[in-house]
UniProtKB/Swiss-Prot annotation:
It comes from the Bacteria. Its EC number is 2.3.1.189. It catalyses: 1D-myo-inositol 2-(L-cysteinylamino)-2-deoxy-alpha-D-glucopyranoside + acetyl-CoA = mycothiol + CoA + H(+). Residues 40-179, 187-344 form the N-acetyltransferase domain. The gene is mshD. This is Mycothiol acetyltransferase. Keywords: Acyltransferase, Repeat, Transferase. PANTHER family: AMINOALKYLPHOSPHONATE N-ACETYLTRANSFERASE-RELATED-RELATED. 1D-myo-inositol 2-(L-cysteinylamino)-2-deoxy-alpha-D-glucopyranoside binds at residues 36, 214, 253, 272, 310. InterPro entries: Acyl_CoA_acyltransferase, Bact_Acetyltransf, GNAT_dom, Mycothiol_AcTrfase. Acetyl-CoA 2 binds at residues 276-278, 283-289, 315-320. Acetyl-CoA 1 binds at residues 109-111. One of its GO terms (biological process) is mycothiol biosynthetic process.
Length: 344
């Protein structure tokens, strides 16, 4: 049997189990199963806003029942089988994170590869929808990698595909040509100074991503959590100024290991165009492209052989700019939307 448990915070053992679960899913699927926001929430005792964790826990170490497919409306029956001997009793075999605000919740769901097809995913999604308090609640669940199994489950549970996030990549090895960045007249670029630039950067970030459901909502705490990460390096965080005011930025990131390298490639470090933003109506034409190139040149000088970035598929202007700089689509993440049926 499998039991579901809601947690406001996680124990150290919970975190270890979830991290192992994520690693197993990543090996099986070839893509990371959760976002950076969720990974940053996986800290013992940490509570972030209204975020909550839903754990699917194996209640028996060894069962002999047949595989049962995910079947809506029969969650208890669907959870009666686990892989014999694979996961001890009390270990986490499925995980969901619920965030966002009351009437517009966002979630991510992952099931251990050895326990798929047994109703765990259906049970987790059912637990998420049941937890929504408001009568008009809406829920968006991210499925990383656009996997067929996730699409099939979403269809069965009446979720609608609404948003696609592209991961783009391009080579960056020494000698790979990059155009010269051309800054608009009067614009200068320097690197980020922690504490000094935090609030100014947050203001420009919020304005640049006013219509973005995640990036535009960043707070000082969100920035502080990332500054505390081992990958944070202000030398790769570029700020554009005009007349002393911040008008744009390019924050780069270096991953120690590419968790989803191309097939038959040895995993190594990879750079990331973490976030590029320009203050609306400021800075002049071409500032976003120039900032992108400045960051790419920095990553190339750091010895990175390739670079990735994430962009919404419907952000046609940004996609056009990135493809014009040699980026191609590597993987897709999909958001599925659900609304509580009207009772009227």
């Amino acid at each position: 049997m499998t039991s579901l448990s809601w947690q406001q915070t996680l124990s150290a053992m919970d975190v270890d189990d979830i991290v192992s679960l994520l690693a197993a899913a990543e090996r099986a699927d070839g893509t990371g199963p959760v976002s950076e926001d969720v990974r940053l929430a996986l800290r013992p005792g940490l509570r972030i806003g209204a975020g909550r964790h839903l754990l699917a826990v194996s209640a028996a170490a060894d069962t002999s029942g047949p595989n049962v497919p995910d079947t809506p409306g029969d969650q208890n029956a669907a959870d009666t089988s686990t892989m014999p001997g694979r996961v001890p009793a009390g270990r986490i075999i499925g995980y969901a994170h619920l965030g966002g605000v009351d009437q517009a919740r966002q979630a991510e769901v992952v099931v251990h590869p050895d326990h798929r097809g047994r109703g765990v995913g259906t049970a987790l999604v059912g637990g998420l929808t049941e937890a929504l308090a408001a009568p008009s609640s809406r829920l968006d669940i991210w499925a990383h990698g656009d996997l067929p199994a996730a699409a099939a489950l979403a269809t069965r549970l009446t979720f609608t595909r609404t948003r696609v996030l592209l991961q783009l990549r391009r080579p960056l090895a020494a000698g790979t040509p990059l155009p010269d960045p051309r800054l608009p007249a009067g614009v200068t670029v320097r690197t980020f100074v922690p504490d000094q630039d935090d609030r100014a950067w947050l203001a420009v970030n919020a304005a640049a991503f006013a219509d973005h459901p995640e990036q535009g909502r960043w707070t000082l705490d969100d920035l502080a959590r990332r500054r505390a990460e081992p990958w944070f390096d202000p030398r790769g965080f570029f700020l554009a100024e005009h007349d002393g005011a911040l008008v744009g930025f390019h924050w780069t990131k270096v991953h120690e290991t590419d968790q989803t390298p191309p097939r038959n490639a040895q995993p190594g470090p990879i750079g990331e165009v973490y976030v590029v933003g320009v203050l609306p109506g400021a800075g002049g034409a071409g500032l976003g492209r120039a900032l992108t190139l400045i960051g790419l040149r920095h990553l190339q000088a750091e010895g990175l052989d390739s670079v990735l970035l994430y962009v919404d598929e419907d952000n046609v202007r940004a996609v056009r700019m990135y493809t014009g700089l040699g980026f191609i689509t590597y993987v897709r993440d999909v958001s599925y939307h659900w609304e509580r049926p009207s009772t009227g």
